[in-house]
Amino acid sequence: MHRHRRPTTALRVLPYLSLLALLLGTACSSQPPQQLAPASYAMTDTGHTFLGTAIERSSTDHDQKSGFRLLNNGLDAFAVRLLLMEAAEASIDVQTYLYHDDVTSQLFSHYLIRAADRGVRVRLLLDDFGHGGQEPLLASMASHPNVSVRLFNPFSSRTVPYLDMLTDFSEKSRRMHNKTFTVDNQAAIIGGRNIGDTYFAADPITGFADLDVLGVGPFARKISASFDTYWNHALAVPIATLWQEELPSLTATRQALTSSSESEKAQAYLARLTSLGIIDELRQQQLELHWARSDVVYDHPDKLLTDPDDDASHMAPELVKLLQDLDNEALIISPYFIPGDALVGRFADWRTQGARVLVLTNSLAANDVAAVHAGYAHYREALLEAGTELWELRPRPSLHEDRSSQPFGSSRASLHAKTMVFDRRKIFVGSMNLDPRSVNLNTEIGAVIDSSEMAGNAAEGFLKLLPDYAWRLQLVETSGLFGNRAELIWLDTGHSPPTVVSEGKEPEAGLWRRFQAWFIGLLPVESLL
């Protein structure tokens, strides 16, 4: 398969490109592009499909509610996607920010082509920043009569795309961060996972602790509507209009994907999926679901073309309305967490009212983007002083935890799930981080599910894992030459009593990484992070 620039590298470099553009003073804005492709929409007559009839039977007694299943394990998340693609009869719609060039992405592409060969319509919408230079493969796939591929907010230069960051920074630094996967307009998955090994427990070195939710019924139709909004936007450009060079034939691409799926690595990974309980549930049509009402919220794609301060196209105000009534507890997981003064103030208000506020984010050692950690670090003392319980994910579980059972499938972990549980009654799952980039610059999607059972189970599981997978931060008063001052400490609460892991210094982070975070923290770039 073709291997070009790595999407993970692209993700890490974006904050630094933003910084460079800011220093150079480039802030050009573009006129909205013209529509380049014919419109197409979700197929509505899919009730007769295998999925449609199965879901209709299971939803009979649930009064227009949707059925939900959290996918907190990477293997489960990939297995469900493969089985849904195998079951597809009418359509598959995929929207993602990153599309790696590795074992799981090639398996994913292989299953898409197999579905297309059966007559299933496939629409694949990728942000142009995150496909890893795989345009020959993607354009070849798009030559299939049943496959369409569009790139969102494409760069004008196909050879040096980052150059656009310097000449058209205000638009090209803003990306489509949504992740959706919908089959036959009947079942849909949204959440934090892109397409690649680190998201699906296939990378032995680094694994993302992530979360998706599978939803069937009315929820799927809402996700289809969001997909259509992006697919038919002028920023979604067919790959054939962008890639003009010679392509591998569809036959050659099909053979390459088949060969990749039969490789030793792919077969070893697929073998790990066969023993999953969720596989048996799906094949026996006995998937355990939580039936509940939900609200789907997403940014309009016009967000990328308007002033960041104009929130008319933003999902954040709607999300705040859905989650503003807090009584007892807020559990927040955000891998990239830069709360700003307003959110710190809201946390303080909740604490004054007697509510518990707990936040889990990445430690510097676990964070894959040091620049983002720099923005977050400024707020730690204020968060703790406001009464927030602040936890940071370790890059590895505690020594007394059985690593063979850890949920990430890798030797090192990085948090990537974006979820919130409010009063153990409502749960948010989506692609949105609590940082300025997600709120004001990129586009995002998420769902608020009103289910005490689902939210309660998620909260209990989350709190049970914390002591072995995260450090708790506290402020202690220390004395020195210039008087007393507050100092951060990191605690391992998996021991009894808790032990201090580090005092005043980011644990398990090397000197260079600490310097990066410190230096970027001196610069006025928080709004870009």
Model-derived segments and their meaning:
Residues 1-11:
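N-terminal secretory signal peptides that target proteins for export/translocation
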Residues 7-8, 25, 223:
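Intrinsically disordered/low-complexity terminal segments and short unstructured peptides
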Residues 28-177, 183-529:
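Charged, low-complexity intrinsically disordered terminal segments
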Residues 2, 15, 39:
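ATP-binding N-terminal substructure of ATP-dependent carboxylate-amine bond-forming enzymes
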Residues 14-25:
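Bacterial N-terminal signal peptides
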